[in-house]
Each structure stands twice: as structure tokens, then as C-alpha cells.
Amino acid sequence: MIQRHHISSASFMMNLLHDNLYDWTIDIANSYDINPNFVLLSILGEIAGADRGHHHIVNENGQENILGLFVCISAPSGEGKSSAMQIILDIFKEYEKIENENFIQRENKIEAKRLILEAEKQEALDEAIISGDTSRLETIIGELKQSKENKLQPVRIFVNDVTAPAFAKTMESQGYVNLFDPDGVSWNENVYRQIAKYWAGEGHAELRITRQGSCVRNPFVNAVVFTQPEFFRKTIMAETQRAMGITARSILYAAPPYRRRGRGKPIGERTKDELRQKLMNLFNASKPDTQGNTPPTKYLRLGMGAAKILNEFNQEISHEVNLNGNGVRIRDWCVRASQQVLRITGIFH
């Protein structure tokens, strides 16, 4: 079973892509003369990242799967890791700037209100000294305290080179973390512990994420990380990460040597425009309102044909498990594979 379904190359997905995804992947890869699998996996992760947990896909049993991925890609220096991500990260940076312009406007309004309250606080204090009635003063102090507690943080559409405290702070502030790193290294164990916390309920439960007891509803974590082979080996062999379930939830791709053809060309304007429009539409659909409230979750459900294929796959798993002495490990692996298939199906949608 493992041999039959083992994937040594992501190219198997190329035949499954919608025409525009295929065209984007090939155009960007040809432009930089790099492995198209790098581009494909980057696009998958970054479409999921732009959605920010807005969509869930539901299987026939009613189980929800968020569209977040955890992709780790191994390749040596000079293979085009940064180039594979560049065009998409530029779009992410552009949108982050747009959202933060709105953030600055909201912050200016909040600051203006705070200054008014501070002036009213002094008036109320003077009145309380004369009258002995502190009710108005207490109300104003309460509003000031609430304003301070609800202070928003600048939007971080994606992060890289992250530490555990930074990861927690970003999640607490906005409810999601997109980790995109074109040249990552081994992470601190505490980062993995943070990720494991967010995944503990598969993203559908209210999870305690800080020592102060703050909670976030439906946390969304998504990552595409390129790394050197030495760090990749450490990641997949580290028992701590495996015990936490991080490795099992990951899409791991060790790239074979890529033979460059030396025929680079500019990325087509159509590719740039279509990819930008796709990501901007997802960003706008998942954008919080002026009060910081996220839009209601949208649910994707399998059609009859897709459900039939998934059931056939699960039946094949059950059959193979009964024939193989390593059945439990195979079953667990296939459950994770099935979940990844659902997520990728939702992303393709």
C-alpha cells in the first residue's frame, strides 16, 4: 500500500489542475527555469493562506477539514526556492499594505475617542470630588480600560523566521497565521508546540493559546516552508515533532535534482493578473469587518461523484490493512492522506 501510494514527485497533480492553475504553474516555472513542483506547492499553500480559514470542506460523514496546509520542501541552494514564492509573496505584501491602511484609519479614530475620554475623565474626577458621586467617573474609566484591552495589532498576512511568542501573539491578534519561508531552517521546539496546540482540535474548537488565558475561535495555521536538505532531514526524523503529530499532518517533498534548460522568460501579464485577482478575491471574501469580526464560515461539500471516489479509496485502504501486518500504521497514514486530498480539493475549488 505504501509503495503503491508513495509520492516521490508532486508532478502527479499537474494532470488534475484546473487550466488556470496549470498555466500559472508552468508559466512561473518556465520564467525562472525552476522545478514546477516548487511553484505548484507554493500556489496551493498561498491560495489556502489567502482564504484564511474562511472555507471548510465537509466529507460525507459530516467531518470538517480546514483548508490549511503544512508543506515542507527540501532543496539545496540555487534551485530557485525564493523564485517559486516571489510573485505570490509580492501580492501578499500588497494586500497587507491595503489592510494596514484601513487599520491605521481605525486606530486614528480609536485614539481620537481615547483623547476625548481622557478629557471627560478629568471633568468627571472634578465633579466626583465636589459631589461624591463617582458613577460617571467609573463608567469612563471602564470605557478606557476596554479600549486598551481591545487595541488591535497591525495585520500580518504572513510571517517568516517566527518564534513561539511571535506565533502566539499573531494568532491571538487575528486568529490565523500564514507561515511562508523561502529559505527556512530548523525551528525551536516551542514553535512546534504552538502549532500542535492550534491543530489539537483540528481547527474547530476554542483553544487556549497564551499564558494569560486568551482564546481564539477556529484558529487557522497554514505554512509553506522551503529548507535545505540537512534541516529537512532533521525535521522529518525529529521524534518530538512526530510525537506531536506535526510530521503526520505535513506534505513533505524532497526535490530530486532539476535539470535546468536555460530558457527563462518574463512571466506573462495574464498570469500575473489572474493570480493577483484570484488571491485578492479570497482576501476580500475573508476580510474581517471594521469591528474585527470574521465573515461566517462557508462550507464546501463533496458531490456524489467525489464522495464515491473517496469511499472507494477508503474501502481499498480497509482491504489493504487486513492483508498487511503493518495495518495500523498504514491506516493512520491513509487517513491523513485522505484529509490532505480533501483540503487540496477545496483549494482547487
Regions of interest found by a model, annotated:
Residues M1-H349:
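Phosphate-handling catalytic cores of nucleic-acid transaction enzymes
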